[in-house]
Curated annotation (Swiss-Prot):
Enzyme Commission code(s) on record: 1.3.1.89, 1.3.1.-
Domain of life (superkingdom): Eukaryota
Main location: cytoplasm
Cofactor(s) the protein requires to work: FMN
CC terms in the record's Gene Ontology section: cytoplasm; nuclear periphery
The keyword Magnesium is assigned to this record: no
Reaction catalyzed: 5,6-dihydrouridine(47) in tRNA + NAD(+) = uridine(47) in tRNA + NADH + H(+); 5,6-dihydrouridine(47) in tRNA + NADP(+) = uridine(47) in tRNA + NADPH + H(+); a 5,6-dihydrouridine in mRNA + NAD(+) = a uridine in mRNA + NADH + H(+); a 5,6-dihydrouridine in mRNA + NADP(+) = a uridine in mRNA + NADPH + H(+)
Binding site for FMN: P297, L298, T299, Q352, K424, H455, N507, G508, D509, A532, R533
Name this polypeptide is given: tRNA-dihydrouridine(47) synthase [NAD(P)(+)]
Zinc finger intervals, C3H1-type: 88-122, 134-164
UniProt cross-references to Gene3D superfamilies, sorted A to Z: Aldolase class I, Zinc finger, CCCH-type
Composition bias type Basic and acidic residues, residue spans: 230-245
BP terms from Gene Ontology: mRNA processing
């Protein structure tokens, strides 16, 4: 369905919409009187959303522990103890028989009768849950898109691609036609089983990583030797044993000392070779983010179907969910699922990683460069405020240790072949001590990063106050001055002959075209803006940026967006029972932000800022009211329009406690 665009005019006191007056409506989203709910329940207005860093504590690990203090149950923060277990099938069909029996009747499974899965397809179908019948999807959405369904007999829409008379699955069109459909709609950056096994079994050589880590170690060791307190010859002679009859030193000790001596000589050679060079400098592909429409990396909600939706709605650049370096190096399945991307995301797709040490950064970047070629940049997350990562030295903890951050970036730059390296930072870890302005100077002089993204908040601040765009502009100016100074230096003339401009991207609170264009038009030092929550609450924000007008999406238009998300979800996670459960869960996670959109047509003033909260309101129709509900049970009701009737055992607990609460 094509979106109907309605330009909203400025108005006076005649009851039409007015532009936002911050002094008049600070913290409050004003709704027209006729749309304010006639209810005594004021809980929605009082409830404050907690936009704690959108990150998956379920995957990273609970932040509590044996030593954590007992607290009263809070109404804000993450629901870390929520149950995300999925219901399993009573009878599970063997993967070898998903597409049916072999034509010659021979067994397809090497385990034969000893296999723990069902080989009798009719027996499996007799225990399979009923078909999903929907108005939104008359036939299997995956079959409709690709001409075949990879889920085969396990598909909950199987009747649309099943020949009952011959008891076999059907395909649509010729092989060439299906190949053409696949070329337009497929996923990239899939790591093979053999490649993953090489990581699990530690067979992958990490040649480049070992090289650069040796260089970094030699430089650090030389620095330690220089700064170590010097011992005089007299003191050294006093330390030696004076008794000639003392027992001789053990051979193992002598051997160890000899090995250390050789290692130190090797480190000395490396240091002399690379001390006056930018050893990390490599030829990279150009990275152009100028005026690009960028979606921020978003853990959990920033999954592949969501990114694909954002590409359809006008985004130019998308990022994977944050991947942890160590699980990547270890070949963990769940972590290697994160760099996957849809073909529509190429070019303009980046992978974000989090790490605490240079060896983690180097090996993760080398593995990504080797196994996932369809990426345009690798981004180091140096801004994540999650306590667990911070205590491990990852995320925003790197802001407190810029030397370590620089080593990580240089190691990544050395091993990533032609893939540019970028970094995302915050203003600092404490409100009273911003460090970004001094940090960018070091990044210019000591690294070859292609882009810097600055979130205009500190770690301490989280989302409690608005982003400081004045400071973002200050840092952008500092970056340009440092660039100019560096390029005039002898080192700069040698190392940056191409004089590539470091891309600078601002981030924080932008959710409308007015802020977007105002910031970029008023500050040439800022190349683009990264949008996070604004693109979750209002996915068509980039359509507004292009049109340079507010778009009042109707409930049917917003339902079409949800339908696209559901379609993309089923193509990604599948249409079997497990896939549908995954689709429903992530649909509800998406709704935990999408429901916060306040239709412009019911607003007294606009645009509504992210930190503004409305009183209870009703929409212009029942569907609009339903999509604006804060009750997770209503989100589940919406999911039934796309994924069928929900199981009685299905329970969805929003990640953020304040994202949803039952209505009275």
């Amino acid at each position: 369905m094509s979106a109907e665009k309605r330009e909203l005019e400025d108005s006076g006191s005649n009851g039409e919409l007015k532009r936002q007056d911050v002094s008049f409506s600070k913290g409050i989203a004003h709704i027209k009187a006729e749309f304010i709910a006639k209810s005594n329940d004021n809980s929605q207005f009082q409830q404050a959303y907690n936009d704690e860093e959108i990150a998956d504590a379920d995957r990273i690990g609970a932040e509590g522990g044996k030593n954590s203090r007992k607290h009263k149950k809070k109404q804000r923060g993450q629901n870390k103890s929520r149950d995300n277990r999925q219901v399993k099938e009573e009878k599970v069909l063997c993967p070898k028989y998903i597409q049916g029996y072999s034509e010659d009747g021979e067994s397809l499974c090497q385990f034969g009768d000893k296999c723990r899965f069902v080989h009798d397809i009719k027996e499996y179908l007799s225990h399979k849950k009923p078909e999903i019948e929907l108005d939104q999807f008359k036939i299997c959405p995956v079959f409709d898109a690709l001409g075949f369904c990879p889920m085969g007999f396990k598909c909950r829409f199987m009747s649309s691609h099943f020949d009952k008379e011959n008891f076999k699955l059907v395909k649509r069109g010729t092989d060439e036609e299906r190949q053409k459909l696949w070329s337009l709609d497929h996923e990239v950056n899939r790591i093979t089983s053999e490649e993953k096994l090489s990581l699990i079994k530690r067979r992958f050589p990490f040649t480049k990583s070992n090289e650069v880590l040796d260089i970094i170690d030699s430089i650090q060791q030389e620095f330690r030797d220089i700064t170590a307190p010097k011992v005089s010859k007299e003191e050294a002679s006093e330390d030696k044993p004076k008794d000639s009859n003392e027992a001789e030193v053990a051979p193992q000790v002598l051997q160890r000392e000899e090995e250390l001596k050789k290692k130190r000589e090797h480190q000395r050679e490396l240091y002399l070779k690379y001390k006056d060079t930018r050893y990390f400098a490599q030829e990279k592909k150009d990275l152009d983010l100028r005026r690009k429409k960028i979606v921020s990396p978003l853990t959990t909600v920033g999954n592949l179907p969501y990114r694909r939706l954002m590409r359809k709605l006008g985004a130019d650049v998308t990022y994977s969910e944050m991947a942890l370096a160590v699980p990547l190096i270890q070949g963990t399945n769940s972590e290697w699922a994160l760099p996957k991307a849809h073909s529509t995301e190429i070019p303009g797709f980046g992978v974000q990683i989090a790490c605490s040490k240079a060896w983690q950064a180097a090996k993760a970047a080398e593995a990504l460069a080797k196994f996932t070629p369809d990426i345009n940049e690798i981004n180091l997350n140096s801004g994540c405020p999650i306590d667990l990562l911070y205590r491990q030295g990852s995320g925003s903890a790197l802001l407190d240790n810029p030397a370590r951050m620089i080593r990580c970036l240089n190691a990544m730059n050395y091993v990533s072949d032609s893939i540019p390296i970028t970094v995302k930072i915050r203003t600092g870890t404490r409100d009273s001590h911003p460090v970004a302005d001094t940090l960018v100077k070091r990044l210019v002089y000591e690294t070859d990063v292609a882009a810097i993204t600055l979130h205009g908040r500190s770690r301490q601040q989280r989302y409690t106050r608005v982003a400081d765009w004045d400071y973002v502009s200050t840092v952008a100016k500092s970056l340009r001055e440092s660039e100019a100074s560096f390029l005039e230096s002898a080192e700069g003339k040698e190392s940056r002959e191409s004089k590539r401009r470091i891309q600078f991207v601002g981030n924080g609170d932008v959710n409308n075209f007015e802020d977007w264009h105002r910031i970029l038009n008023n500050d040439e030092n800022i190349d683009s803006i990264m949008v996070a929550r604004g693109a979750l609450i209002k996915p068509w924000v980039f359509e507004e940026v292009d049109a340079q007008q507010h778009l009042d999406k109707s409930s049917t238009e917003r339902l079409e967006i949800l339908r696209d998300y559901a379609q993309f979800s089923m193509e990604h996670w599948g249409t079997d029972e497990y896939g549908i459960a995954q689709c429903r869960r992530f649909f509800c996670e998406f709704m935990s932000f999408f429901h916060r959109y306040i239709p412009i047509g019911i607003c007294e003033r606009y645009p509504v800022q992210l930190n503004e909260r409305p009183p209870n309101w009703v929409g212009r129709d029942d569907l609009e009211t339903l999509m604006g509900s804060t009750d997770a049970r209503d989100w589940i009701k919406l999911s039934e329009m796309f994924f069928g009737k929900v199981e009685e055992s299905f329970v969805f607990t929003p990640k953020h406690k304040s994202s949803s609460f039952p209505s009275a």
